[in-house]
Amino acid sequence: MIDFGKVQADAVKNICKSKITGKAADYRIYSAVTIDGNTYIPLMYKGISIYLIPEKYSLLNPAFAEVGNPMVEKIFKSAEDAYQLTDTKTIKLLPDGIQLKEFKSPFGKSVFVDEKLIKPFGQGIRYYASGNSDIVYIKEVDEWLGLAFATRVKENEQ
């Protein structure tokens, strides 16, 4: 299970540091969204993954939140048609050191996600994709935890 406290602490630390240094923050906090009847505080990391902090576990100051992002709800709306991915237990190492975890769709298509993006979600979770498999949704039994964007790998690199 994701450590909601650690993720929030990392985000606050990064946002505060960015205000001091003037550099762009890696994290963005958005106002609450409701997905499948549950209320979450979306926490976007580098624009390539989103952590959904259940409102009941949120310790984030609403002053840090940007105006709600309707895209978050829209993106998770397409998760309703998502199919479960199978973890192949395979890690592909790219020349630049990035480790990609490989999943398989029910149709045999390989889907790769940067290991660094999904590691904070913890163990014992389920992965889903829909359509063209560009987005990998991450879910516990009852609640969505977030998403990460898939990494495209050329056929000759597989």
What are these regions (language model features)?
Residues 1-158:
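DNA polymerase processivity clamps
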